[in-house]
């Protein structure tokens, strides 16, 4: 049985780690280099660094900061934000990242995923998908029903600011066929709520693609992780608030998961 990965996330804005609610109302959470070192030491399996305003502000990810983070950790490290070309990806990897997260750049130019896979290998390419419920009925979309309401999951870009009209399930399938070796799936509806991951969305994506999926958005306690692992068979759980603010170390969370018969690396 493959061990499940626990991945702290650093959402970085202007050189500081921040955390929001539903991608809005941002507050400061600390220094990225300090937090990265702490999480690496505390038993994190990987680290995700998202420059959350890079795409929005049309600027490149802060290479120097990425390089400083890479120096203080000894775990795999994914960096996303403002990746729109081969050069953007190459710069991130040369700065010390192991994998590149692509969201807006892949939606705008899906062939970028194939180019990245061809040059750097599938294992380096992570498609980041930010999805949100859209309550309009559309026969061309993957429809769901919950509490008597019908909806589909829409892909958003530019840090959750712009809708795309893309169905998240269909896009995940296409993106992984084009070359993404992993899906970083964030529920905008659940982001920062601390009331659990989006099980419906996560399970559907896990069942649709043949590459590893990371669940993101909504984790408030270790039990939320055990629930998403059991109910969706997702490969990894990403969290921010629980580690930044809740005084839970990664190892403490892993011990709780192990006690619930979730296979984790301790």
UniProtKB/Swiss-Prot annotation:
Catalytic activity: 5-[(5-phospho-1-deoxy-D-ribulos-1-ylimino)methylamino]-1-(5-phospho-beta-D-ribosyl)imidazole-4-carboxamide + L-glutamine = D-erythro-1-(imidazol-4-yl)glycerol 3-phosphate + 5-amino-1-(5-phospho-beta-D-ribosyl)imidazole-4-carboxamide + L-glutamate + H(+)
Protein's UniProt name: Imidazole glycerol phosphate synthase subunit HisF
Localization (cell): Cytoplasm
CDD domains assigned: HisF (cd04731)
Function as written in the Swiss-Prot or TrEMBL entry: IGPS catalyzes the conversion of PRFAR and glutamine to IGP, AICAR and glutamate. The HisF subunit catalyzes the cyclization activity that produces IGP and AICAR from PRFAR using the ammonia provided by the HisH subunit.
Lineage: Archaea, Nitrososphaerota, Nitrososphaeria, Nitrosopumilales, Nitrosopumilaceae
GO molecular function: imidazoleglycerol-phosphate synthase activity; lyase activity
Gene Ontology cellular component terms for the protein in this record: cytoplasm
Key word Amino-acid biosynthesis present: yes
Keyword Zinc-finger carried by entry: no
Gene3D superfamilies tied to this protein: Aldolase class I (3.20.20.70)
Keywords, sorted A to Z: Amino-acid biosynthesis, Cytoplasm, Histidine biosynthesis, Lyase
GO biological-process terms attached to the record: L-histidine biosynthetic process
Active site residues per record: 11, 130
Organism, as annotated: Nitrosopumilus maritimus (strain SCM1)
Family that this chain belongs to: Belongs to the HisA/HisF family.
InterPro entries: Aldolase_TIM, His_biosynth, HisF, IGPS_HisA/HisF, RibuloseP-bd_barrel
Subunit structure as annotated in this protein's UniProt entry: Heterodimer of HisH and HisF.
Domain of life where this protein originates: Archaea
Coarse class of the protein's main subcellular location: cytoplasm
Pathway assigned to this chain's UniProt record: Amino-acid biosynthesis; L-histidine biosynthesis; L-histidine from 5-phospho-alpha-D-ribose 1-diphosphate: step 5/9
EC numbers on record: 4.3.2.10
